[in-house]
């Protein structure tokens, strides 16, 4: 998926080490990603993880997908009493990557390798071409809602 997982917390490095060690001692699992100690909250504030007008540094349980240009593409906000859903995070990441590489959108409840939604035509000539394509391939409901199989469908199967 060509993606890096990074933890970020305003806790100290010593606190992170104690947490990682505790996880390892109790479960035998080594956390396989780095955790950044953002003691002054600079990174957390930049991405809106901590409000700039609030002095508290209470932890938030959010997942941010940030692209290689530093743009936040997706934020999943979890209440403190709800665990994260890793399959949904991976599905959302795959959806972003597939949509970007196909210049398309993924519909509600999309799962990898299902058809994606083509962007609507921008001219009347494109509309006529799209309508004919739908009639020929039966790949849409109307000129503004048509689908295609993602170009890199094999990749999303390999990444599972």
Q: What is each model feature region?
A:
Residues 1-160:
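Chalcogenol-based redox active-site neighborhoods
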């Amino acid at each position: 998926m060509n993606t890096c997982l990074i933890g970020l917390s305003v806790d100290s490095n010593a606190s992170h080490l104690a947490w990682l060690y505790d996880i390892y001692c109790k479960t035998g699992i080594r956390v396989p990603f780095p955790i950044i100690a953002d003691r002054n909250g600079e990174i957390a504030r930049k991405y809106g993880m901590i409000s700039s007008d609030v002095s508290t540094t209470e932890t938030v349980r959010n997942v941010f997908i940030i692209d290689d240009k530093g743009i936040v593409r997706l934020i999943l906000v979890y209440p403190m009493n709800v665990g994260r859903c890793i399959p949904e995070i991976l599905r959302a990441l795959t959806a972003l990557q597939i949509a970007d590489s196909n210049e398309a959108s993924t519909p509600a409840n999309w799962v990898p390798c299902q058809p994606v939604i083509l962007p609507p035509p921008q001219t009347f000539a494109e509309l006529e071409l799209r309508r004919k394509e739908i009639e020929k391939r039966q790949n849409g409901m109307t000129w503004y809602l048509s689908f295609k199989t993602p170009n890199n469908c094999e990749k999303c199967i390999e990444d599972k």
